[in-house]
């Protein structure tokens, strides 16, 4: 349903944000 799709997108966004944050900390 719509709820599961929203959850899936939320997880994807969180992963992307986490990756970019890790990159910034490495610099």
UniProtKB/Swiss-Prot annotation:
An annotated GO cellular component: extracellular region
One record GO biological process: defense response to bacterium
Main location: secreted
Highest rank taxon of the organism: Eukaryota
Record PTM Glutamic acid 1-amide, positions in chain: 27
Tissue expr: Expressed by the venom gland.
Keywords annotated in UniProt: Amidation, Secreted, Toxin
Gene Ontology molecular function: toxin activity
InterPro entries: Cupiennin (IPR035164)
Subcellular locations according to the entry: Secreted
Family note: Belongs to the cationic peptide 04 (cupiennin) family. 03 subfamily.
The protein's name in its UniProt record: Cupiennin-3b
Source species of the chain: Cupiennius salei
């Amino acid at each position: 349903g719509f709820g599961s799709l929203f959850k899936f997108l939320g997880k994807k966004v969180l992963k992307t944000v986490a990756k970019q944050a890790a990159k910034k900390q490495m610099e």
